[in-house]
Amino acid sequence: MKELIRTGKTVEEAINLALKDFGVPRDMVEVEVLDEGGKGFLGLISKQAIVKVVLKDVIKESAKNFLKQVIDAMKLDITFEIEETEDTIKFNLQGKNVGLLIGRRGETLDALQYLVNVVASKYKGYERYRRIILDAGNYRKRREETLTRLARKLAKKVMETKESIELEPMTPNERRIIHLALQDHPYVETYSEGEEPNRRVIIALK
Amino acid sequence: MGELVKTIAKALVDNPDAVEVNEIHGHQSIIIELKVAPEDMGKVIGKQGRIAQAIRTLVKAAALKEKKRVIVEII
């Protein structure tokens, strides 16, 4: 059910019928008017309006609209580009205020990413869900590199001192980066301890 | 600031028209009261308060720009 053809007394009425059937707001569809309808020849016969209403990519559209609204409400000077893969929709945020939107250790970016996924997942029933990822000024890539370097450095220290090291609390994604960085390490192993949001990675000798 | 909370809340709930936001301005802090339809409470709080926490984090970032302390209360 990606497109519907509906008729009505007016174009507006026909569009509204389609929106009701789709169950989405007006900004989630594109409308093509097939027949304006109205009064026919000499106003004797009134013709029905006919419209074709096509559902947009609702996951992407709802995420895009939500992001724009939040950026406007925060009065930030930020634009974004969209990169799509089979499983993800990635928004790359740019502009002079991105630092503010990243926040301390990315906590603001993670919060916004979480909210945008909650908002977009309302439309899960319409198409296969694709996870939404937010990045800003290459933050995610840089953070991954920093964490990988940190993991290697700490693994060396664990080998030297023969004592386990407990890292600071991290998000699931950041912990995953640490685990991955050391998964093939010959002498140390990693595991997590504690409850969210204070769950931490431990690096220990094997 | 209230505008931001309103924007986020409206996008989360099923009854956006029932969303009400009230700002109480103090000397150094602002209290933002968020009210939604009773059946939408879960939508703005989330499992273990995760959604409410994310809203507060975003508001905190916006408040940084205005150098004020902001408290978001869901009532």
Swiss-Prot record, chain B:
- UniProt GO molecular function: RNA binding
Subunit (UniProt): Forms a complex with KhpB.
Query: Which NCBIfam families does the UniProt record give?
Result: PRK00468.1
Q: What does this protein do?
A: A probable RNA chaperone. Forms a complex with KhpB which binds to cellular RNA and controls its expression. Plays a role in peptidoglycan (PG) homeostasis and cell length regulation.
Biological source species: Caldanaerobacter subterraneus subsp. tengcongensis (strain DSM 15242 / JCM 11007 / NBRC 100824 / MB4)
Q: Which Pfam families match?
A: KH_KhpA-B
Protein name as it appears in the record: RNA-binding protein KhpA
Q: Which Gene3D superfamilies match?
A: 3.30.300.20
Q: Got a GO cellular component term for this one?
A: cytoplasm
Q: Which family does it belong to?
A: Belongs to the KhpA RNA-binding protein family.
